[in-house]
Structures are given as structure tokens and as C-alpha cells.
Amino acid sequence: MRHLRNIFNLGIKELRSLLGDKAMLTLIVFSFTVSVYSSATVTPGSLNLAPIAIADMDQSQLSNRIVNSFYRPWFLPPEMITADEMDAGLDAGRYTFAINIPPNFQRDVLAGRQPDIQVNVDATRMSQAFTGNGYIQNIINGEVNSFVARYRDNSEPLVSLETRMRFNPNLDPAWFGGVMAIINNITMLAIVLTGSALIREREHGTVEHLLVMPITPFEIMMVKIWSMGLVVLVVSGLSLVLMVKGVLGVPIEGSIPLFMLGVALSLFATTSIGIFMGTIARSMPQLGLLVILVLLPLQMLSGGSTPRESMPQMVQDIMLTMPTTHFVSLAQAILYRGAGFEIVWSQFLTLMAIGGAFFTIALLRFRKTIGTMA
């Protein structure tokens, strides 16, 4: 009981110390409010109001149909230009896409000559160029096919394709961006808060107090883990309910308590990583550099930004030893697909094992270095 009382009382002290750190409080509030909202809304996953110019050298019924097929919200109203103005407009950055419809285009299409339409893309606008190129191809092909169908006898297709989008029927990027922002910020804050809590002990000269107190390194670690983990657990739950469900209107298909249990297991592992990094860094700037080196690979390679199946096999195997990979997997399964414990139990078990391993490594490192931190 004495050990539990020490862990509880020192944890309350950590929470009070955090309340006096305005910079950390600002980071916490920003990460789970403004950051979540901006990740869901500022960067669209689909084409949105792309500037486009068209040089219509044919002036036919078909070319007019193509011109009129580009409209909001995917494109701005097309600007009609001449072929000579096309290069200058692209060089000046006025258009992302410039289309050149050649003379006699409709006549050649009806004659079956397969004429070419030139589509120029400003590839420096990466957020629009790749997606927009596919949009334009589909739009032009659709207009040409429907126009030609009126002049030719086309048989009905043998197969009718019905596409149904599961879990996100409207392909709304906000549904994905908001939840992934919370998942990434949970990992970031867990590492930053526990690492900075250890650095604060050194900077404030309170390590000597810990050394003379009747507490063990294990108890000190547990203090950092439960106090900082509780903060992240509470604010992430509030952000999920208030920001994602409330402000963004994203439907949560699965059990929020089950997801929060997964958050707790992930925090056990990531807070241990934070303590390990806190024993290596000698100051807050050093901790910040270490966080950048560790956090970016964890977020980019965990399967949240890019499907793991698209990565090299060696990277997939290495990332299986990281807690974020399994946390992202269970979070997406629960929140997006409504998975129950019978589906995600293996990720829970793996997180427990990885958390235990990281905790043991951090504890050994902490025991070895606590005497030199004073």
C-alpha cells in the first residue's frame, strides 16, 4: 500500500506541475482542437476548385459539351484562352490544368480517327495535379462516349457494375483526417509529456529530492506514466466526442470505451518510449530533436498515412515491433468499421507485449542513469 500511495501522491504532484506549465497546456489544447479540425478540413483529399483553362480550337457541339462539363466544386469555371496563351498562363501559375481541343475534333471523333486532346498539368501543385489528371480523363472520355453513342448503335453492356463505398459512402476526407489527427497526437503527446516531465526534474533540481526519498526507480516511472498518460487519455476522449463527433460530424461506428482501452495500452508503450528518450536528452531542445527523429517514422510508417501493404517488406516487418502500427490498426477497425473485441483482441495482446518490452528497457536505462541526472 505504501508503494501505491507514493505513486498516487507523486502523480498528483506531476499533474500540478503540468498545470503550471503554460507552454505544455497550450500544446495539449492546440493538438486536440485546432490541429484536429485543420487536419480534417484544411487539406482536402479530393480535387477542390482547381483553376483550369481551355483552348477550344474546334468550336463544335462536342467541344462545348466538354467545356461545360468542368464545374464546381471540383473546378473553377474554365477560362477560355487561345493556344498561344496556354504556355504563358502555366508559366505564370494562373492555371493548374490547360486543355487544348484541336480543330475538327468532333468530325474526327465521328469518323473514328481517334484524335488527341492535349492536357497540360502544372505538376508543382501536387495536391491537385495527380488527382485532377484522372478527373479530367474520366470527364472527357465520358462526354465523348455519351456523344458518340447518339450517332452509333451501341449494344447494351453485358455486365453492370455497381460500386458501393463502405464505411465512408461520400468519400469525405474529414472522416479520415480528424480521427488520424487524434491518433497521431496521442503518440506525440505521450512521448513529449513524459520526456519533458523527466527533463523538468533535472532543470528544476528536484532529482536530488527523488534520490533521498524512499521510492524506487520503478515507482518514479509509474508516476510519470500514469499521470501523463491520464492527461492524454482524457483529452483524446474529449476531442473524439466533442471535435470529431460534435464539430466535424463524423459518425463513430464502434465502441468508444473499447477504443479508449486501446489508447491506454498504446500510452503504456509510448510513455515508456518518452521516459527512455528523457534519460538520453540533457535538455528540452535535445528532447525536441529526438522526438522529431522518432515521431516522424512512427507516424509515416505505421499505416495511417500510407497502407502498410504498399511499403517494402522489410519496413513492414520492422514496424510490427512498434506500438503505433498496432494502435492505428485497432483504432481504424473500431472507429471506422465498428469492430468488436473479438476482432481486435490480437492487437490488444500485441500492444501489451510491446508495452511491457519498452517499459522494461526504459526501466533498465532509468535505473542506470538516474544517479547521473542530478
Can you name each region flagged by the protein language model?
Residues 37-47, 281-321:
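Transmembrane helix segments
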Residues 174, 178-195:
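Long, hydrophobic alpha-helical segments
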Residues 2, 197, 276, 335, ...:
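Junction motif at the cytosolic side of a transmembrane helix
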Residues 33-36, 217-291, 296-299, 342-348, ...:
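Alpha-helical transmembrane segments and their short interhelical loops
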Residues 191-213, 225, 370:
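Transmembrane helix boundary and interhelical loop/hinge segments in multi-pass membrane proteins
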Residues 1-11, 76, 314-325, 374:
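Short, membrane-interfacial amphipathic segments enriched in basic
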Residues 1-175, 343, 368:
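Extracytoplasmic/periplasmic domains immediately adjacent to an N-terminal transmembrane anchor
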Residues 84, 167-171, 251, 302-358:
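Membrane-interfacial helix-loop-helix junctions in multi-pass membrane proteins
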